[in-house]
């Protein structure tokens, strides 16, 4: 690797860390908006966003959050063109971001909240590529109706598959799990 390539990689790593710090601070500020990262960093990619997500996950764990699993978004391919995405995406779900539907969930602390209905699955084993339907079903421990309260740190819900990782701080509420 050349000196220029090493310097470029170090600069990119520093930028990703800066973005993660800014996102983490915005999510914890109780309503602070930031300009979309991809408008300030034109080379910011979905892969970079997942690096930011990993750093924010580490920050959450340091705060005492316990990861419970992941939320998979954009599983409906008909929405991809409208939102400029080309594959499903995911975000972490934590013990402090999961709520029972029987308990009221105030919306005041959220930044521009949006509510999305969900079907939630609890997995006992991770699915593997190439599984048939029966094998995939054996990975599922429970199913529940639920909803996701999504918030965005970007003003007016600016969206692009490149810069939005709003799932980092969404809340999920689930009904009773059924085997």
How would you label these PLM feature ranges?
Residues 2-179:
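Catalytic-core "active-site belt" of small-molecule-metabolizing enzymes
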